Swiss-Prot record:
The gene is tatA. The chain crosses the membrane at residues 1-21. It comes from Pseudomonas savastanoi pv. phaseolicola (strain 1448A / Race 6) (Pseudomonas syringae pv. phaseolicola (strain 1448A / Race 6)). This is Sec-independent protein translocase protein TatA. Belongs to the TatA/E family. Signal peptide: none annotated.
Amino acid sequence: MGIFDWKHWIVILIVVVLVFGTKKLKGLGSDVGESIKGFRKAMNDDDKPAEQPAPQPQQAQAAPQGSPLNQPHTIDAQAHKVDEPIRKDQV
């Protein structure tokens, strides 16, 4: 005999049926079932490989030797001080 015995579950079930009604519970059950089916379908679709793999794009032309594409770079600029507005309640 744990905290929730089978008798407790029956009482909870009766209270839920009285509060929500059978129509809402049927609708909720069908919505949950459809959600589970959709989830399973999506999971199965992810497992299957694509039927026709997309053709791989041709490689772009190599960058010239002096190009800094892969080199780290620094932006030289100065920060400007921002004037914060004065709060009226502090004056």
